[in-house]
Amino acid sequence: GTDRFELYRETAGLGGFDASNVAYDKLSSGRYYRAADGDTALGFYEGPNFHQTLVFNQNIVATHRWNVEHQSSLGYNLRYDEIYSNVLGGDFGDVYLVPGWDGYTMDKGASTTDFSFFVEHKYTRERVQVTAGAMLNYHDVPTGDSSYFFAPSLDVLYRLTKDASLYATANRSMRYPTYTDLYYNRGGAQGSLDLSPESAWNYEWGYKQKSGQVYTSAALFHRRSKDLIDWVSYAGDPIAYASNITSLALTGIEGGMQYNATKRKALLRNAVVQAAFMRGVTPEVDFSSLYALDYLQAKINARATQRLGLGFFLNYSITLQDRVGTYRSVGGEEVNYDPFALLDFKLYYAPAGGIFKRQFPFQAFVNINNALDAAYYDRGNVIQPGRWVSTGLEFRFR
């Protein structure tokens, strides 16, 4: 199928709603106009974005156990994807009609081929388990340039007891630019065909334990990234540019505790507490980062499910979050992200015997997200949704 993205609502009645009061119409001049209040869309807007994608993926893995202690695996992954669009990609000469949308065409496109070969060996003896592996990746980008990437990995596990263990991991990872990063050029955003893949070395040391119905974990981690892909803007320039910006070193700790009841009639079905704290080191820069440098320096989440009786249950969750960095206000000022707290609830009815006397799992629910109606920003100068109430039914057939 074809994806359609509207910056301004143009189609009245989508989703069963009467949108005649909010829909924009295209004038003969090419501008978009809303008759209900006389509002005119921004001048750069030329209509909805259409994207049609095709993805082929093949993955083959072979594993051989040599004996009780040694096991080897090797395999490869092949991925090919292409996109046809009216926005993303290079001009390919031909013009295609957008299926199901009269009057719209796509005249741009691009494709990528990604091939990975990997090998891994696992050694297990008594309390020790060591896994070492490596991946060689070939990536053919839309510009015709190709690149190779080598990613080794090492995992070590030591069992202190039957239910407790220490572990350490080290690996290298990478991320290639998306079609949006490469080609998007509308509304004050400019992609770049000169982007390089970003890469990172990741290290983690941790502890895991299970004691009865309680799971506990704690870890120390470190990540060193370079050639980060980000959208950046400079003082006095309204354009956001896709760029490989800089390096970033993140060091942090995370931990959590989880309780799962073994009996359905338990008053407290489950409870989870998770926390993560990190600090970053990066060179001084003369631009504003959209997301790569604006990392979460603190996040705490606690959630639980409580049985109320008669088939009713209540989920509640509280999240505390503190993000570093800034965003640019409508007036062009740099504004620091403020910490915020979110409270969410879910009340649902799920009878143990299902419905229709057929043991079909059933759930009727009401969700209340951001119950305290907190006003906050999380990414860029976009205020996040306030209190959001939704309801629905869920059936599972087996």
What are these regions (language model features)?
Residues 1-145, 159, 217-220, 266-274:
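Face-selective signature of the C-terminal outer-membrane beta-barrel domain
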Residues 58-64, 117-123, 154-158, 205-209, ...:
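Residues on the lipid-exposed face of transmembrane beta-strands in outer-membrane beta-barrel proteins
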Residues 106, 110, 145, 159, ...:
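Outer-membrane beta-barrel signature, preferentially recognizing the C-terminal barrel domain
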Residues 9-23, 89-98, 147-153, 183-191, ...:
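Flexible, surface-exposed loop regions and adjacent strand-edge segments
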